[in-house]
Each structure stands twice: as C-alpha cells, then as structure tokens.
C-alpha cells in the first residue's frame, strides 16, 4: 500500500497522510510506503514528524535504492 504526496501543499498532504495511516491500520497492513519526493525536503520532514508521533507507526526509514531512496519513506505499522 502506498501514498503519493508529490506536488501537494503540506496541509493537504498531511491530511491525506492521516487518513491513509488510519486506513492502513484498519486493514492490518504491516508497512506502508509514502512517496513525498526529493525536492527541498520540507514535505519529507513533515511526513516523518507525523510518523514519529503516530501511535500505530513503530518505525520508519528511507526507501531503498529501488524504492525511490530519499523520495520515499517506508513505515512499519504496529500489529
């Protein structure tokens, strides 16, 4: 399951992220991929701040080389 936030304004992107995380939790997804793009890194920082404080996210990391690298964050969801 993945969410593409590229090109979105921060407020809209973070609203979509919250909804996405809720749906992923309800679906029992073990992990999620969030595509925020590389750009200036502002959206990446905001996404990771939300993930850091989300009760159902246990950890997150930059996507692998074949997943999009620094333009993607992969979050592990709690059981």
Model-derived regions: residue spans:
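Long, charged, low-complexity intrinsically disordered regions
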Residues: 1-79
């Amino acid at each position: 399951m993945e969410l593409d936030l590229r090109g979105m304004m921060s407020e809209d992107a973070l609203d979509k992220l919250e909804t996405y995380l809720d749906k992923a939790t309800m679906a029992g997804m073990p992990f999620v991929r969030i595509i925020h793009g590389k750009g200036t890194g502002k959206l990446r920082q905001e996404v990771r701040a939300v993930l850091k404080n989300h009760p159902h996210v246990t950890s997150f990391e930059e996507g692998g080389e074949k997943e999009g690298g620094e333009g993607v964050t992969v979050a592990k969801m709690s059981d």
